[in-house]
Design a protein with these regions (language model features):
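Residue-level signal for mature regions of secreted extracellular proteins and peptides
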Residues: 11-14, 40, 51, 57, ...
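Intrinsically disordered regions, especially transient/low-confidence alpha-helical propensity segments
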Residues: 20, 47-48, 59, 88-89, ...
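Fungal secretory targeting signals
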Residues: 1-20
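Short, surface-exposed binding/anchoring microloops in extracellular/periplasmic proteins
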Residues: 19-56
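Acidic, aromatic-enriched beta-alpha/helix-loop junctions
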Residues: 49-70
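A general secondary-structure boundary signal
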Residues: 15, 25-26, 73-77
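Extracytosolic low-complexity repeat regions of secreted or lipid-anchored proteins
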Residues: 63-107
């Protein structure tokens, strides 16, 4: 599942040249967010800034870094109190939407 999520995210980003956020809602495990952006020159710096903005509301198991194709890829598990708007706002504060805005959507 992890490979398919990363592949789907990378394919989508290559098509639209933008940023993307999706999430899964698991009955037991809570929410799992997937964030991606292409063209980010300082992936580690943006990852750290983004997580600094999101961590107070969301906490959780966090992974963020550069994908094999060079794009930023982040994913993390959080409790249901971690609303999509916290992610959207955290991205804006970290990037000022320089690589596109995100609006987290539930995966169907």
């Amino acid at each position: 599942m992890k490979f398919s999520a990363i592949t789907t995210l990378a394919t989508f980003l290559a098509i639209v040249n933008a940023s993307l956020c999706t999430y899964d809602d698991h009955p037991v495990n809570g929410l799992r967010y997937y964030i991606g952006a292409e063209g980010v020159p300082d992936v580690l710096g943006i990852c750290n800034g983004f997580w600094d903005n999101v961590k107070p509301q969301c906490g959780g198991d966090w992974q963020c870094g550069q994908a094999a194709n060079g794009d930023l890829h982040a994913e993390f598990q959080a409790y249901r109190k971690c609303l999509p708007r916290f992610i959207n706002d955290g991205w804006w504060y970290a990037t000022k939407n320089q690589w596109g805005s995100i609006e987290c959507k539930l995966r169907q």
